[in-house]
Amino acid sequence: MHKYRTHNCSELQISDVGQEVKLSGWVHRRRDHGNLVFIDLRDHYGIIQIVFTDQNPQLMEDASRLRYESVVTVRGTVVARSEDTINNTLPTGHVEVLAVEFIVESAADTLPFVINTEKDAPEDSRLKHRFLDLRREKLHNNIILRSQIISHIRHLMMARGFTEFQTPILTASSPEGARDFLVPSRMHPGKFYALPQAPQQFKQLLMVSGFDRYFQIAPCFRDEDARADRSPGEFYQLDLEMSFVTQEDVFSTIEPVMYDLFNKFTDKKVSATPFVRIPYNESMLKYGSDKPDLRNTIIISDVTEIFRDSDFTIFRENIRKGSIVRAIPAPKAATMPRSFFDKMIEFAISEGAGGLGYIQFSETGETKGAVAKFLSTQQLDSLKATASISNGDAVFFVSDKKEKAARLAGKVRIRLGEELDLLEKDCFKFCWITDFPFYELNEETGKIDFSHNPFSMPQGGLEALENAKTTEALLELNAYQYDIVCNGIELSSGAIRNHKPDIMYKAFSIAGYSEEEVNKRFGGMIRAFKFGAPPHGGIAPGIDRIVMLLAEATNIREVIAFPLNQQAEDLLMNAPSYVEDKALKELSIMLSPSARKNAKKE
């Protein structure tokens, strides 16, 4: 017989009755019934009930003292449970093991939190003792699901002719939109590597190298703040690139992968392919977001022209100063109490709005609300037609500069969807957001900057860049850039790449980069493009976010084995941490006085 186990804890069935077995695992639960002690033994695979009887008093007494989460090896005989003790919630629920011997392989200390329930413990405690947290069923299953998803992705990609690669982790800094994690070089004092924010340049270089279809389950590193759907520090993406493709080719390649993946790992309804295509400007108008949740049926409308000549002075004056007005319908909300409308106004103000106007349309067509009395019958009819409002509905209004008004309307739309329970249940709604602006104004400097990926191809190519003589014209340029969105979560950005050096130099010069700086920062790729680069494009869906959706987790840390906390700290391994002066000296690094003072405190 094996030293530790003949079976796992999910394996034994009624057909095994009478068999002598050996099992190893963790003490999940213990119940003392006087003349019987029951232990639920748990391993990676499941749970089985172990029984200790008073036929062996010493063994039963020893079992009654076992601490939860101690690791034990048990030898015994499989017996059938009586009819009234069968547990149909367990695969092993028709049998139990009558113990004749057990060995404590490793005794557990007092637990910092309970393992055998899903009751929440403080997150910092969970992360500090992640090895315990990972034993909990839900989190344990999430990590198994993650492995299964990645394995299936590999199968799907290889079936489509993609080759898996590994690209460097130590590389050069690249403007991907976030801060780099820098790694000092001992051999080259004063110089630094950067951990890749994405394998962007390398995957493009592989296309130039003659490989046709690349993919990688790629680790990416970005020094950015945490969010519910974004883990600080490190994340993984399904990174892919293809040669000789158009935007539609990329869509038609990744859509069946997403459809197959979500259908395999969920029973929920998944959007049929092809997924809906929504241009960026249309998305910002209709949904107030570039990552719309299409489960929400509310459509935002622009009603600026209706209010331009109205008697509602506040909106009329805002419009005269360059603002717009957006209408957000609230279906069947006309009869909601005043507290509902007050609550919505408070929410809008908390999001930065100056206020939130509204009108209620009764089932008979009568209006209620401060805004209504300033609109003529013709204007009210026009409003109902433009915003698709029916009797029995309400409608909210925001007025501000275009970008802010769009964002505020989007926030109100999301909140209304939640408050009115409008989201379609049990479904995954996919869409593509296309035609992103190539440039944007940097909020801090007021200068032209890339809006997303600087390596994307501008629509219209070099001619479009050269003909855009004003800031306004530059901001109207679009890129062959796209996002795939599911249930309001951006899963990925992608683009058809700029593979022509002359267009790249021009695009970067508009964003304030000299040719010398471009050569210095992207010399390897620019040089490669001068030796025959194929048209190419790609995308990189986020693995963590995909798993988060399929696991129905509310926080991305629930699908990562060892995540950082919201302050980008690893509480288990105590990172980041100060290092010895000797190590800093080898790297030619000197701490600032304030940092040195903090280091001495530790």
UniProtKB/Swiss-Prot annotation:
GO cellular component terms given for this protein: cytoplasm
InterPro entries per UniProt: Aa-tRNA-synt_II, aa-tRNA-synth_II, aa-tRNA-synth_II/BPL/LPL, Asp-tRNA-ligase_1, Asp-tRNA-ligase_1_N, Asp/Asn-tRNA-synth_IIb, AspRS_core, GAD-like_sf
Pfam families for this protein: GAD, tRNA-synt_2, tRNA_anti-codon
Keyword field contains Aminoacyl-tRNA synthetase: yes
Top-level enzyme category: ligase
Region annotation Aspartate: where it falls in the sequence: 200-203
Subcellular location: Cytoplasm
Reactions catalysed: tRNA(Asx) + L-aspartate + ATP = L-aspartyl-tRNA(Asx) + AMP + diphosphate
Keywords, ordered alphabetically: Aminoacyl-tRNA synthetase, ATP-binding, Cytoplasm, Ligase, Nucleotide-binding, Protein biosynthesis
One GO molecular-function entry: nucleic acid binding
Binding residues for L-aspartate: 176, 222, 452, 497
Any single GO BP term: aspartyl-tRNA aminoacylation
Major subcellular location class: cytoplasm
Known EC number: 6.1.1.23
Positions that bind ATP: 222-224, 490, 542-545
Site (Important for tRNA non-discrimination): 33
Assembly description: Homodimer.
Family listed: Belongs to the class-II aminoacyl-tRNA synthetase family. Type 1 subfamily.
Family matches, as PANTHER family: ASPARTATE--TRNA LIGASE, MITOCHONDRIAL, ASPARTYL/LYSYL-TRNA SYNTHETASE
Function: Aspartyl-tRNA synthetase with relaxed tRNA specificity since it is able to aspartylate not only its cognate tRNA(Asp) but also tRNA(Asn). Reaction proceeds in two steps: L-aspartate is first activated by ATP to form Asp-AMP and then transferred to the acceptor end of tRNA(Asp/Asn).
Full protein name: Aspartate--tRNA(Asp/Asn) ligase
Source species: Rickettsia akari (strain Hartford)
Lineage: Bacteria, Pseudomonadati, Pseudomonadota, Alphaproteobacteria, Rickettsiales
Gene: aspS
